[in-house]
Amino acid sequence: MTMTSEEVITLIDEEGVEHDFTVLDILEVDGTEYAILIPVDDEEQEDEVVIFKFTEDDEGNEILVEIEDDEWEKVADAWQEKVGREH
């Protein structure tokens, strides 16, 4: 999946509801790529960062999936370290 920073993407949840996110970054941790996203229109969650993992579905299409808390912490730490080095 080719995404660029600041690109807005639409994801569809399990109930078929669309959600727009701004792509903050694409990050590789331990050989796996992750998308760092923030919700576009949700004022209550504007500081909330969402992290999804890139994987493939049964047909070989690249998709984004939710991750568990421990994996989230590892990726969030790696992203904060990367952002700290860039600034």
From Swiss-Prot:
Belongs to the UPF0473 family. This is UPF0473 protein Daud_0916. HAMAP family: UPF0473.
